[in-house]
A protein has these predicted regions:
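A bilobed periplasmic-binding-protein/Venus flytrap-type ligand-binding module shared by bacterial periplasmic
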Residues: 126-133, 168-171, 240-251, 270-271
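A ligand-binding cleft/hinge motif common to bilobed small-molecule-binding domains
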Residues: 84-88, 208-226, 275
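Mature extracytoplasmic/periplasmic domains
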Residues: 246-301
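Short beta-strand->loop
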Residues: 96-102, 115-119, 141, 209, ...
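Short, polar/charged alpha-helical segment
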Residues: 24, 28-51, 65, 220
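Extracytoplasmic ligand-binding site segments that recognize negatively charged/polar headgroups
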Residues: 28-35, 57-58, 73-206
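Periplasmic-binding protein-like
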Residues: 123-124, 181-185, 191-192, 223-249, ...
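Extracellular/periplasmic bilobal clamshell ligand-binding domains
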Residues: 288-323
Length: 323
């Protein structure tokens, strides 16, 4: 890391060389969600003070690298976008193994069996369409059909982490695979930007169909936007905003309390209040969302996705002719 990069990061980092008894959280949650999470945890544990930093996952990883090089203490806890990032950190020995007693309420696919990270919500990816669209898709395969040629927008896996996980999941599915992505490209599917750009294109009618994370479409529909959302027949890809404890967490005891809280029934009810599908079994989804136990989640391997990331990006660039 350059001296310039360190100089830019350290003024932000030094205030968080926290005093004993505080819990330091780094999160990629939206600011409002992060504040609600911290407030609820501190209400349940009034003896713990939480200091938190919010940024994108990539930016947080860069910040921690700079802080490590500068000798600044790491955060105690991470609550970030996806399991692939945390799988990489686990493989590098950066995360602590913690067997939360709350894990018994979660599907094994939603947490590290060694206790390195735990999913806290389900943000699924499905199909959004404009209410003025002619056909209503029911499957991922539909989007590659002639009726949808030039009419579909999707986020680019070169830009969006959720889109990269979506690609990794579908391309390892026996019924879809890379042939499906080639068919999308041949069907003049537009792949660029993130989920926000896709939603804007569909809601405005520029593109009748899109590949999108669930909450953007369902919240907008509830507010009167002319969109509908489909949970495809083949199943859903998903990201889970997992929580993890750093291996050298200065405040390990309170970090464990934080993990247990966000996984608890109360913590998951908070997830519902924020407008997301809970990861915990037995907790009702928000109004307008499907029941948690009705979701068909596609098989996903975080370790394989991590290993295949660069190859997947390269192949996607070749298939879609983008950089």
């Amino acid at each position: 890391m350059s001296r310039l990069a360190l100089a830019m990061v350290l003024p932000l980092a030094l205030p968080f060389a926290a005093s004993a008894g505080t819990l330091k959280l780094y999160t990629s949650q939206p600011n409002e969600d992060a504040q609600k999470t911290v407030d609820a945890f501190q209400a349940a544990h009034p003896d713990v003070t939480v200091e938190w930093v919010r940024d994108g996952t990539t930016q947080l990883m860069a910040r921690m690298a700079a802080e490590t090089e500068a000798g600044v203490p790491t955060p105690d806890i991470l609550l970030i976008a996806d399991t692939v990032t945390l799988e990489g950190m686990a493989q590098e020995g950066q995360l602590a193994a913690y067997q939360s007693p709350e894990a018994e309420n979660y599907d094994p696919a939603l947490y590290s069996d060694q206790g390195y990270y735990y999913s806290t919500k389900l943000i699924t990816t499905g199909i959004v369409y404009h209410t003025g669209a002619g056909a209503v898709p029911s499957s991922w395969a539909d989007l590659a059909g002639a009726d949808y040629k030039g009419m579909v927008a999707m986020p680019s896996p070169l830009y969006s982490g959720a889109a990269l996980i979506h690609l990794a999941t579908l391309t390892t599915n026996d019924d879809l695979g890379w042939d499906y992505y080639q068919a999308l490209a041949d069907n003049d599917t537009r792949a660029e930007g993130g989920n926000g750009a896709v939603f804007k294109a569909v809601a405005s009618g520029e593109k009748p169909y899109g590949v999108l994370v669930d909450y953007m479409a369902l919240r907008a529909r509830a507010e009167g936007s002319p969109v509908e959302f489909v949970f495809p027949d083949e199943g859903l890809t998903y990201v889970t905003e997992p929580v993890a404890i750093m291996a050298d967490a200065p405040n390990r005891a309170d970090a464990e309390k934080f993990v247990d809280f966000v996984l608890s029934e109360a913590g998951q009810e908070l997830v519902v209040e924020m407008g997301y599908i809970p990861a915990r079994n037995g907790v009702d989804s928000p109004e307008g969302f499907p029941a948690r136990d009705s979701l068909k989640l596609m098989e996903f391997d975080a370790a394989r996705t991590l290993a295949d990331t660069e190859a997947n990006k390269t192949r996607f660039s070749e298939v879609f002719g983008v950089q």
